[in-house]
């Protein structure tokens, strides 16, 4: 049972997770209330995340690519949820326009899930290659770099809703940069998964190193608190600068 999460970490902030296609199905079936209650109770969640993984769905042989009614379903989900709702991308990032629509239907927080971290398009391409599905393998390979980079997505969304930076965060310095761009938090995946394969001590060592890196970046930036990084002077260069310029984002 997923309840072990709360049993092992009684004071942790626990986020339940469900896909937008499931939410849309629940809404159409008239079972939204029941399923929201079940999802919340399953892990005694402090918040519920709805992942918007359309890029992955396009490539999966079992993927659901119908998006009609998704915003209406998500709005209804937000209305009945007893806890805040996070809208979460899974590798393709969120645009400013989508961020505003999500805000308007009552979403509380954005998890940008930008390009630069795990590529589910590439993963699905490899799955298809192993199965001998050449068409989907080629589709996944062609879309492997699709999406908005994490840094750009953070900057695009941060003025609309509290924004979590996820996608390619590999160090405490990366987290500091994301916070300076306007994120309120940063999420890490792959580095911890690699350490977890080595054991608990490796995870703790990595987390301690991450903390030292973040604190060092704060000290060197004159930031007394994490939120002070948002006031740090930013210099944005290269492709990220060009993305922001073309999108008209400061």
Kindly label every feature range from the protein language model.
Residues 1-101, 105, 119, 124, ...:
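Active-site entrance/lid segments in N-terminal catalytic domains of soluble metabolic enzymes
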Residues 2-14, 70, 108-111, 130-136, ...:
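Short, structured secondary-structure boundary patches
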Residues 4, 38, 76, 101, ...:
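Alpha-helical scaffold segments in soluble metabolic enzymes
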Residues 10, 41-44, 79-82, 104, ...:
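Generic secondary-structure signature for well-ordered alpha-helical cores
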Residues 12-40, 146-166, 170, 221-239:
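Electropositive, surface-exposed helix/loop patches at the edges of structured domains
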Residues 32, 67-70, 146, 150, ...:
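Generic structural signal for well-ordered, non-membrane alpha-helical segments
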Residues 68-198:
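Glycine-rich phosphate/ribose-binding loops and adjacent secondary-structure elements
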Residues 192-250:
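C-terminal extensions of enzymes
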């Amino acid at each position: 049972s997923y309840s072990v999460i709360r049993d092992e970490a009684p004071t942790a902030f626990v986020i339940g997770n469900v896909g937008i296609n499931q939410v849309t199905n629940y809404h159409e079936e008239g079972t939204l209330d029941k399923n929201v209650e079940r999802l919340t109770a399953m892990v005694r969640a402090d918040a519920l995340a709805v992942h918007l993984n359309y890029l992955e769905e396009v490539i999966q042989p079992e993927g659901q690519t119908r998006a009609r009614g998704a915003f209406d379903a998500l709005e209804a989900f937000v209305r009945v949820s007893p806890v805040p709702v996070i809208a979460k991308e899974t590798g393709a990032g969120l645009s400013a326009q989508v961020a505003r629509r999500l805000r308007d239907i009552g979403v509380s927080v954005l998890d940008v899930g930008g390009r630069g971290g795990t590529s589910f398009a590439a993963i699905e391409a490899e799955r298809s290659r192993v199965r001998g599905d050449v068409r989907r393998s080629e589709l996944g390979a062609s879309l492997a770099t699709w999406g908005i980079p994490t840094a750009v997505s953070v900057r695009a969304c941060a003025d609309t809703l509290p924004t979590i930076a996820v996608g390619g965060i590999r160090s405490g310095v990366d987290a500091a940069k994301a916070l300076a761009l306007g994120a309120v938090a940063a999420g890490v995946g792959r580095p911890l998964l690699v350490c977890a394969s080595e054991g608990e001590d490796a995870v703790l060592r990595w987390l301690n190193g991450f903390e030292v890196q973040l604190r060092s970046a704060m000290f060197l930036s004159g930031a007394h608190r994490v939120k002070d990084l948002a006031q740090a002077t930013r210099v944005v260069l290269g492709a990220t600068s060009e993305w922001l310029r073309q999108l008209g984002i400061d």
